[in-house]
Amino acid sequence: MPILKNDWAPLLEEEFQKPYYLKLREFLKEEYRTRTIYPDMYDIFNALHYTPYANVKVVLLGQDPYHGPGQAHGLSFSVKPGVPVPPSLVNIFKELHDDLGCYIPDNGYLVKWAKQGVLLLNTVLTVRRGQANSHRGKGWEHFTDRVIELVNEKDDPVVFLLWGRNAQEKKERITNPRHHIIEAPHPSPFSAARGFFGHRPFSRTNAFLTKCGREPIDWQIENIGARAE
C-alpha cells in the first residue's frame, strides 16, 4: 500500500510497524486480490495526503467508505466528480445552504475542503463492494484512533465535527481543552431530522476558528458541470 509522503509520515511511521497493522495489511492484500474493495488502493490514505498534519483545522469524522461503484476516493462523505451525490451529503449541503447560504453544487467532490485543512477522515478506511461495515474490527480503528490522538496533541485549536454515534464514540480521545467539539445526529436521511438540520456546524466552526485567530473555511463547493476533474 502506498506510503505517506507528507508530515504525517514520521508521525505514523511506528504505527505501520505494529502487529495489528501488519495483520491488517495482509488481510487487505488478500481482499484486494480476491474481491472488489473500495476505495482504490492508491486512494486509501487520501484524507492524510490532501490535509497535512500541520494544516489540520477541522476533523470531519465519517464511518466507512461508500460501498457503491466509483463513489469512494478516500475522503469521508466525498464522492468523485460525475457520481450522484449520496443522501447524507445531500443533507450536508442542505444544512450548509441553510447555515451559510452556500448554493447546492452539482457534485459531491470535497477536495476543496480537504485542501483548506478539513481532515475528511473515515474511522475505517476500506470496505467491500456492497457490504457496509465489512472491514470493521480488522484494525483500521486502531490506526484512525492514533490519527485522532495526534490531532488532539496539536497546539493549534481544531474543531471536531462528530456526527452520529460512531463518530461520537471518539470523543473520549479529544482531551485537549484548546479544541472545540460540535456534536449532532448523523446526516443520513434516517437521522438528519433528529437534530442534524439546524445545528449550524459550518458557521459555528468558522466562528471558533476566527475567534482563535485562524483563517475560516470557505465551505462553498463550486459547480463543475461537464468539466472533467
Swiss-Prot record:
The active site is at 64 (proton acceptor). Belongs to the uracil-DNA glycosylase (UDG) superfamily. UNG family. The lineage of its organism: Bacteria, Bacillati, Bacillota, Bacilli, Bacillales. Pfam families: UDG. Its EC number is 3.2.2.27. SMART domains: UDG, UreE_C. Excises uracil residues from the DNA which can arise as a result of misincorporation of dUMP residues by DNA polymerase or due to deamination of cytosine. Keywords: Cytoplasm, DNA damage, DNA repair, Hydrolase. HAMAP family: UDG (MF_00148). The keyword Oxidoreductase does not apply. InterPro entries: UDG_fam1 (IPR002043), Ura-DNA_Glyclase_AS (IPR018085), Uracil-DNA_glycosylase-like (IPR005122), Uracil-DNA_glycosylase-like_sf (IPR036895). It catalyses: Hydrolyzes single-stranded DNA or mismatched double-stranded DNA and polynucleotides, releasing free uracil. One of its GO terms (molecular function) is uracil DNA N-glycosylase activity. GO terms for biological process: base-excision repair, AP site formation via deaminated base removal. This is Uracil-DNA glycosylase. It is found in: Cytoplasm. GO terms for cellular component: cytoplasm. The keyword Transmembrane does not apply.
